[in-house]
Structure formats: structure tokens, C-alpha cells
């Protein structure tokens, strides 16, 4: 699996890159602004983004700000021309669907992806929440698709009636089996309630429809996308995004996701293990004086 680092902090990018583990970077405008604002020595955003592109030889995903296809294409060309010459590694993040409500156009992202790829500008279809969205982005020619694991998990948990901050924290891990047990229990409660009123309502209850949805978790979305892409030989690569803990990284790697884009704190979590620390303590105790002498010669 390739590892991208999901950050705008140049010091984190440089540190992780020095370990030889970074294959690319994903970021967004708000993260970049925070990183620039936190610097003691003030530099322009343009100079800062150029520094990110220079630091990493792999792809660097940069985002557009508009919602219309025409505007996104113009912004993408501008960003690409501004930064790609630095290290020939710029990828443009395009939301797969830019609509913010039901009465807005749903296809602007797909349109922009197609046009940009035809112009030779690589795209990363972002905010992917379903296998269908990933399939359409791949058909349009996207270089990458980014399913958002953490956000999908949050959505599923809330639909099950769990409350953020009370029943789960942002970084907490729920495996599919645990989620399935919760789902079954919730369905039982609703069916019991509906039977008392009218058994026929079971078939139209929106809560039951939501709980019977085919998607089990964010990792499950990656699994389904992977299967579709393999079936139809799509060249589009899968970037598992919105990763919040080390377990998710392990699971998407097991599935065969092409890339996991990981925040720095999760990378730190990946390298830690209590038994490794314990082993190091024992190891240092076991070093005998005769062995230490070898290092003094």
C-alpha cells in the first residue's frame, strides 16, 4: 500500500518523508491557511504550497473552491500551472458532487473531472461516500477516488441512533461486526414497536430501510469499490481518506486499497505498541558490560 500524509504542516511532511514512508500528500485550503498562519516567519500561501510540492516527489493533491464545472476547470488549470512546474506532481481535488442541497445540479464534479483528465490534468475525485460515486468518477477518467472512511462511519452510526460525543468519539473504532450487532438490535426494537401498531408498516418504515442499507462501514465502501474496479479493469486508484485510527489503515491495506492517506498522529499511532516498548526496556536491561565494550573500540 502507498502512504500519503494527510496534512498541510510542512514540518510533519518533512519528518515523515525523512523516514522513507511518504508517497504523496493530500491537503485542503483551510489546513494550508492554518499552517501558514502558525509560522513565525510570514510567507505567502503560494510560496508555502510550492514548498510542499518541492518536498515530496509523489502526488500532491490541491483543491478547487468553486461548485460549477466551468469555474472548477478554470481554477484547476490555474493551480496546476502555478505549482506543477515545481516538481511535476500536482493533482487536482474535485468533489464528486458539488451540490449542497437537493435542488442543485449533481453532475458538476463529474463534468469537471472528465474535462480536466482530457486536458492531461490528473484529478482526485474527493468526498466519495458510496461505491456508485466512485464508479462514475472512474468512468469519467479520474486518476484517483477518495472514499471518506471516517465520515461514512459517522453517518452510519448516527443513522443507527448513536450520538456523536456521547456514544462515540470522532477517532473511535467500530468494526463491522460490532456495527452489525448494533444494527440488528436497533432493527429488532423498531420491528417490535411497529408490530404493536400495524405489521404492514414494517415494509415502509424509513428507519428500517436505513438500517437495512448495504453499506456496513467506511472500510466496506473501500472493499466494494475495489471489487468494482477489479471487475471492470478501471485504472483509477483508490485513496482511503478520512482515516482516524491505525485499525482503519490495517483494514484498508488488507483489502488492497492502493493508497491510504493518513494524518501524522495516526502514523505515530501505527508505529507504537506497548509490547515493543516493554521489549525495549527488557533489551536495555539485558545488555552486558562485555557487549558494551564493543561499541567503545
Question: What is each model feature region?
Answer:
Residues 21-22, 57, 142, 257:
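A structural motif
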Residues 24-25, 92, 145, 260:
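Hydrophobic residues within beta-strands of alpha/beta enzymes
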Residues 5, 9-13, 19-21, 27-109, ...:
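Active-site beta->alpha loop and helix N-cap motifs at the rims of alpha/beta catalytic domains
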Residues 32-36, 156, 270-271:
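A short acidic, helix-capping loop that chelates divalent metal ions and anchors anionic groups
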Residues 263-269:
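A hydrophobic, small-residue-rich beta->alpha segment in the mid-to-C-terminal subdomain
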Residues 1-3:
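Extreme N-terminal starter segment of soluble prokaryotic enzymes
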Residues 100, 104-114, 122-263, 276-287:
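Catalytic alpha/beta core domains of metabolic enzymes, predominantly
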